[in-house]
Amino acid sequence: MGDPTNNNDSETKPNPATYWKSRFPVARIKKIMQADQDVGKVAQVTPVIMSKALELFMQSIIQESCKQTRLHQAKRVTVSHLKHAVQSVEQFDFLQDIVEKVPDAPPIKAERKTKRPRARRAANEGEHNESVPAKKVKKNTVKEEEIEKDDESATTETPVKEEPTGEETEADHEEKASVDHGNFSDKTTSEASSASGDE
């Protein structure tokens, strides 16, 4: 009886990730059914069955609407996607009159354009917009991305030269000049000479 190795409880319970309990309000369904004068008494189980049928119907029409949304490469399910779902599935023919008034969805989009990376876009904007002052940046290398996949197979590195901004000191000019001419002298000697000149 109390055998811990034989646990059937895990086999009978459904996985919570795949099972959810969603029921439409049975009392409200019963009121709607009784509002019709042709309907007499309603058995107690009838609204429960109608609730389950409504749930299955909603699940079916929403799944088909999601398929239409994916076909149109949209991010949101809209009324026009619901209209296309009703028109494409024979089971939903009874809804044709209702969805006729809904405007059609835009035509299916072609492949979306690939976006340029932000870093490259910002670099290109900086080259074309000279009214914005450039930031003080030391000499760096930037990897250029492939413009077209077929043109180049590898990336190249190119040095980026910054224009002087007027905020630079004489030491910065000397350092840049020594780097540009291939003269890699000690930083300490250039700093020492500029420090002794400042005092």
UniProtKB/Swiss-Prot annotation:
GO terms for biological process: DNA-templated DNA replication; transcription by RNA polymerase II. This is Transcription regulator complex subunit bur6. Disruption phenotype: Leads to only a few rounds of cell division before arresting with an elongated cell (cdc) phenotype. The gene is bur6. Residues 112-121 have a biased composition (Basic residues). Its main location: nucleus. It holds the Pfam family CBFD_NFYB_HMF. GO terms for cellular component: chromatin; cytosol; epsilon DNA polymerase complex; negative cofactor 2 complex; nuclear replication fork; nucleus. It comes from Schizosaccharomyces pombe (strain 972 / ATCC 24843) (Fission yeast).
